[in-house]
Amino acid sequence: IVMVNDPVRKDMYRKLVNAGAVGFISIAGSPLDEGVDLVPRAYALPKNLPGEEKKEAGREAVNYDNRIPGVSIHYKDAIELVTKGASQVCLSVEQEIVTRTSRNVVARIEGTDKAEEILTLTAHYDSVPEGPGAYDNMSGAAIIMELCRYFHAHRPRRTMEFIWFGAEEKGLLGSQNYIKIHENELSAHRFNMNVDLAGQLVGGTVAGVTGDASVCSILTYMAHEIGIGMSTKNQIWGSDSNTFAWKGIPAMTLNRDGFGMH
């Protein structure tokens, strides 16, 4: 059994399996936590069953001959295990395996003279166990809703879709489902603007662009013209904009960094 001082994701899981580990313990929390001995954690691992492979265009096939169990414990418990030199640990687990259905919500406003071209404004509405989700990401969902109200009253030239994605925190599942269902109209998509994290009074605004560097230049120019303090980064972004970029659609995530995420 291996104790790992990091979240166990795909690459680490592969190393553990290949090394012959029979299980793993990952560590969460901080020695500064007071009155806390539990920290909610959920990490997505490959869903492949033993002997199966999942192949997707542009993505690495993952195959495991066996599966190993793992558990996340608090930092303080990890220190106790190490200092006491524990060689055996009894772990009791009570859990229920459930399946849930997530949904996307789409509002479409037809354009006027360029209705055949589509712009998408998106935000995910799900959250994680660590917090109620006001910052991540009901703040973004609220911004998209207000923009939808505005453009409903002021018709845009291009068709606009306002999309609230579910299951983003589970691996961009909502946006991937949208792309799959709307595959035949993706050629009409011109740009995706995603909002993920907003509303921090003290912080910095970042536009994370996954697309041509010229998009960064245009956004920087526009922000300067209207007096918005904003930096741009040209990179892959860990949010639903990445799903659109994967299909060749220029995309960005508007992000307001601040203290803490949840």
Stretch-by-stretch model annotation:
Residues 7-10, 29-33, 77-78, 96-99, ...:
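Solvent-exposed loop/turn segments at secondary-structure junctions
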Residues 49-134, 146-153, 157-159, 180:
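Soluble metallo-hydrolase cores and metallopeptidase-like ectodomains found primarily
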Residues 1, 22, 144, 159-161, ...:
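A fold-wide structural signal in alpha/beta-hydrolase
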Residues 53-61, 68-70, 78-79, 155-156, ...:
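Metal-dependent peptidase/peptidase-like ectodomains
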Residues 17-20, 152, 245:
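Non-catalytic positions within long, well-ordered alpha-helices that form the structural scaffold/packing
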Residues 1-61, 132, 230:
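Extracellular/luminal Protease-associated
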Residues 130-142, 169:
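Short, conserved micro-motifs enriched in small and acidic residues
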Residues 3-7, 12-13, 66-71, 93-95, ...:
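Second-shell loop/turn segments in exported
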